[in-house]
Amino acid sequence: MDDCAYVTWSTGIGVGLCVDGHVLRGKNGNAGHAGHSFVVDDQDALCGCGNRGDVESLVAGNAIARRFGHDAADWLGRASAGDAAAQENVDGLCRILGRMLYNLVATLDLQRISLGGSVFWHHRAYLLPRLQAHVQAHFPALTQGVILAPAGLGDRVGDYAALALVPD
């Protein structure tokens, strides 16, 4: 697959990009910091990088604990079990991350986004259809056929990704 991304949803939001069959690194090696992009206007959420209201400040695991008073695992578990308040909050998280995913698809014409990270991985059955719905809700000419899927390497994907970047 020549045009794809890996998105980690964990204590931060990170993205690895492959465009035209090549890893996209950027001028300073910082391509993929989409977690520091803005998709809503929320100046109350402070990110570790100093931004206010970026995606990471709103949906990362530590942001969930800060915003909702529950750690991510507990809050997502409650949402999965049917807790209405947790479901409403998690739907909001998926809307924010879904917008970021859509922006990646719209900007880079991606075929596939593989998802991983501890927040996503442990609740993937609940989160994946919600994220897919948010991506597919916009501009079908761009999003039709785009695949969102759990990372095939599971919770080891970060290890392999780091090894892939080691120079020969």
What are these regions (language model features)?
Residues 30-42:
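A short, polar/charged loop-to-alpha-helix boundary motif
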Residues 6, 13-18:
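Short beta-strand scaffold segments in enzyme catalytic cores
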Residues 2-3, 23, 41-47, 51-168:
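ATP-binding/phosphotransfer module of carbohydrate and carboxylate kinases, centering on a glycine-rich
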Residues 16-20, 24-26, 39-40:
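Short beta-strand-to-turn element immediately C-terminal to the catalytic PLP-Schiff-base lysine
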Residues 1, 12, 31-34, 145:
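A structure-centric signal for secondary-structure junctions around beta-strands
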Residues 10-12, 119-120:
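Short glycine-rich anion-binding loops that position phosphate/pyrophosphate groups of nucleotides
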Residues 7-8, 27-28:
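Short Gly/Pro-enriched turn/cap motifs at secondary-structure boundaries
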